[in-house]
């Protein structure tokens, strides 16, 4: 009986360690969004995500918007295209950056305008790691990074061209 209890205890400890290790597998940094100009109903959230063991970002949600979707922007010819994705693969040990002109979390039907300096909660869903909640800081309109530096558009060629969604 005692050996069964020891075996059960050891098994539970190993399970707890494995669950803890999986919980630490995802690192999310540099979470930010741009402030929205008056009346805008859409915005995008950005972050840097790293998974030590590999994972897949599969979805997102936030009280700041009715809908949050994973999107990607790409240039096709002279047209910037934005399309929803069912997920983003996170290769083991490599950081994946969600940024303007690339991967991002598209927020639609905003609950209220995003104002510079505000924060909001964002839940990211992962295939292996489950849900992770982060706090997103709102940078100025036109910011190109979490520090809030505005950009003239020169680093995003084609942004003045037609965009398809």
Feature locations, PLM:
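Bacterial N-terminal signal peptides that target proteins for export
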Residues: 1-8
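Short, surface-exposed loop and linker segments with low hydrophobicity and enrichment for Pro/Ser/Thr
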Residues: 5, 19-21
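N-terminal signal peptide c-region/cleavage motif recognized by signal peptidases
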Residues: 11-18
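Compact, glycine-rich, soluble single-domain proteins
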Residues: 23-165
